[in-house]
Amino acid sequence: MGHPSGQNATASIGWRVHAFRFLVYFTGLFAAALAPWVNRTFGSPTIEQVLYHLRFAEGAALEMSEVFVSTFLVEVLLAALILAGIASALHTVLEQGRGLWRARGARALPPLVVGGGLTMLLMQFSAFSWAAAHFEKDRFAQSYLDPAAVALMEGKRRNLILIYVESLEETYSDQALFGADLLAPLRTVGGRSLPAYRAAPGATWTIAALVATQCGIPLTVYDDDIRSVKAERTFLRGATCLGDILQARGYRNVFMGGAPLSFSGKGEFLQDHGYEERWGKKKWLDAGARPPGTPDPEMGGWGMYDDALLERARARLAELHAEGQPFNLTLLTLDTHNPNGYLSPRCRRDAVNGSEEAFRAIVGCTSAQLARFVRFVRDEGYLKDTTLVIIGDHPAVGNPVDAKLRSVADRRVFNLFVGAQPFPAHVQPLVSFDMFPTLLEITGARAPDGRLGLGRSAWAPDTSPSAWVLHPNLPALAGSAAYQRLWSGNPG
């Protein structure tokens, strides 16, 4: 008969082995479940994007995080726990069975599961490309044209109304996918569109899209030692962007967005690049916007509904135009944000059932509200000295109609120019970086060859894409001295 203490020790060791084995399986299966969940929910974020948001989120993301928690708990955490339990039980069966192949199978299973899961997760974040890119040449330095070093040709100044529409892409017009053209209201207001406008590499999230279209550069992570919190300008303080140039030309830059300004450093970017007036969720609430839970609310969980934002923008536009100073009024909507969007009470339909139908209603409502805004601008006579540009910030991801959107191979970003001069007969395919010199040219300032940053103007048909756009490498930016200087502001 064995000694009790020996039996207890054996049982304790056995329990620890089983617990460790479960933890190993859980780690691998958690990583394997996390990778497709991230892809469905956020697309294909890079390591830079993840690190960037960890540094700049400032807690505002918590206001929206609850919408992702339920799917994460079920599709990742619970699934990994259940599968780890099954794998641990299978391991025990193999271990207790007879035969060499069973013993080898039991030993090989844990490293295979962990290695496979971690590999899937690393591939989801392009980790291998990120590591390899640090050994490549600095193609950004070869391609970037500093706007501060370019003598712009000044023409007649025009005001600019620039509307970024959250995740709006041309695919929503596909009647075969959605049973109707969800953007039909915007097809009735006139204007012209670029035939092939796509998100630039890395510009598939909102703040990166703002930087790409207003500065002509990608957005990636920076080193802490080059971004001093005591500096007067902290967000890309070495870059010259749309707001900087317009401010120097005597424009008043006004930003009106529904979401918190603190999220992803958006407020810092705007403040540091010429936007004297900035409206976001907190400022709207402080100004008396009707919060959730009140009759006819103007605010949802993440911020101001699009119809309320556009109503406020109409009033501010009238004031700006009456003042006589050239202006740039930039708006950023939010109702079409993933994962489920935000349906304004003034847009609800009794027939809305299910998340997909509700999301189609959201897209249709935002489209109708934008069309109404365009008609207001035209009816008030503002187009005589003002150009209105409506663009999606980036393609959609992780919403209720994501599967339908992904079934389309060529996903183009929505764009509409109202009051702009005609485009050349043959406009080359353009990306987000190209919007920077294009927007400047709309206001009357043109680069001699139409090129600024990494972009080229839509009215420069013979200008070829930059080398970086032709062969983009986002991970290599982390090692680019030229790119780091845009954060440090140090010309050396």
Give a label for each model feature.
Residues 1-133:
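Transmembrane and membrane-interface helices of multi-pass
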Residues 128-144:
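Alpha-helical transmembrane signal-anchor/signal-peptide segments
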Residues 146-492:
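Solvent-exposed soluble domains appended to multi-pass membrane proteins
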